C-alpha cells in the first residue's frame, strides 16, 4: 500500500509524489504486463529482448563516457 501525506492542502505536490512512488514500485509496468495473458514462450522472448536492449544501452553509455 502506498501512503502519501498531504501537507497544508497542497494537492498538486501530493499527486506528483504519488505518481513518483507508483513509478518506483513499477506499478505501471505491472499493470501493462497483466493487461493481456502472455504465454511462457513469449515471456522468455520478451525478457531476452529486454536484456539485449539494456546491454546495448549500457554499451552506448560506456562508449560516450570514455
Curated annotation (Swiss-Prot):
Gene Ontology BP terms: translation
Pfam families assigned to the protein according to its UniProt record, in alphabetical order: Ribosomal_S21
Keyword check for Protein biosynthesis: no
Domain of life: Bacteria
Transmembrane segments: none
Keyword rRNA-binding: no
GO cellular component, one term: ribonucleoprotein complex
GO MF annotations, alphabetized: structural constituent of ribosome
Keywords noted in UniProt: Ribonucleoprotein, Ribosomal protein
Family membership noted in the UniProt record: Belongs to the bacterial ribosomal protein bS21 family.
HAMAP family the record matches: Ribosomal_bS21
Protein name: Small ribosomal subunit protein bS21
Organism: Rickettsia africae (strain ESF-5)
Amino acid at each position: 500500500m502506498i501512503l502519501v501525506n498531504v501537507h497544508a492542502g497542497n494537492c498538486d505536490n501530493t499527486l506528483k509524489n504519488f505518481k513518483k512512488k507508483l513509478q518506483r514500485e513499477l506499478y505501471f509496468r505491472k499493470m501493462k504486463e497483466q493487461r493481456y495473458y502472455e504465454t511462457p514462450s513469449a515471456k522468455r522472448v520478451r525478457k531476452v529482448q529486454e536484456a539485449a536492449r539494456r546491454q546495448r544501452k549500457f554499451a552506448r553509455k560506456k562508449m560516450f563516457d570514455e
